[in-house]
């Protein structure tokens, strides 16, 4: 199940990561006239601490909702027992894929000619703890939103609601849930702080 979810989300996640990496570095090094190293550090901060896990979970939510509904139709209220752990694992792995894609996009967009030095600076700015937390956060976000969505869709099917409307409703509810989880995470569980990378 996790493998099927990953295959469905892999391509869009890679594309989203590349677009984010290219966009952030081009903006920072172009109109904002920042150094190449600062641009990459900004990209790392955005991907790992601010927008990465939530953006990834939202993208996966939109792609996987029809499959989650299908499992609820087949398995009823028991669907979450297999879907939720699978979604959590997929969320963590996709976060790693998203991070690599964003970093590749950032390096490609960098105006610096020394590619080896660019990669060295990039790796120097990545803290393993931050990467692990981002993967954990993405897994928790996607797992919880999967549980919520399947529980709500099971209730809707009992009331004989239209499946298309159920998917639409859960996309909206999932977005709100993700925003609330993000708010709790950055204010209570893991407040945002800036850590200087080694020189």
What is each residue range found by the language model?
Residues 27-51, 101-143, 147-169, 192-199:
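Membrane-interfacial helix-loop-helix connectors in multipass membrane proteins
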Residues 46-65:
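Long, hydrophobic alpha-helical segments
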Residues 92-109, 147, 175-185:
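Bilayer-spanning, highly hydrophobic alpha-helical transmembrane segments
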Residues 1-7, 160:
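Cytosolic juxtamembrane amphipathic/interface segments immediately preceding
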Residues 10, 14, 64, 80-101, ...:
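Selective transmembrane-helix segments that form parts of the transport pathway or gating/packing helices
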Residues 8-30, 176-188:
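Hydrophobic alpha-helical transmembrane segments of multi-pass membrane transport/permease proteins
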Residues 68-85, 160-163:
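Short cytoplasmic-facing helical segments at TM-TM junctions of multi-pass membrane proteins
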Residues 36-39, 62-75:
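Transmembrane helix boundary and interhelical loop/hinge segments in multi-pass membrane proteins
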């Amino acid at each position: 199940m996790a493998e099927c979810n990953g295959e469905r989300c892999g391509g869009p996640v890679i594309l989203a990561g590349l677009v984010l990496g290219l966009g952030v570095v081009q903006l920072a090094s172009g109109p904002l006239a920042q150094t190449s190293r600062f641009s990459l550090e900004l990209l790392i901060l955005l991907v790992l601490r601010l927008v990465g896990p939530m953006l990834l979970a939202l993208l996966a939510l939109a792609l996987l909702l029809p499959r989650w509904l299908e499992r609820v139709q087949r398995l009823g209220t028991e669907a979450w027992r297999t879907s939720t752990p699978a979604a959590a694992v997929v969320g963590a792995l996709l976060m790693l894929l998203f991070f690599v894609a964003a970093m590749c996009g950032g390096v490609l967009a960098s105006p610096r000619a020394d590619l080896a030095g660019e990669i060295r600076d990039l790796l120097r700015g990545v803290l393993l703890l931050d990467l692990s937390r981002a993967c954990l956060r993405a897994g928790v976000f996607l797992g919880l939103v999967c549980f919520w969505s399947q529980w709500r869709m099971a209730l809707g099917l009992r009331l004989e609601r239209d499946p298309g409307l159920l998917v639409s409703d859960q996309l909206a509810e999932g977005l709100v849930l993700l925003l609330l989880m993000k708010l709790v995470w950055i204010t209570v569980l893991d407040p945002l702080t800036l850590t200087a990378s080694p020189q």
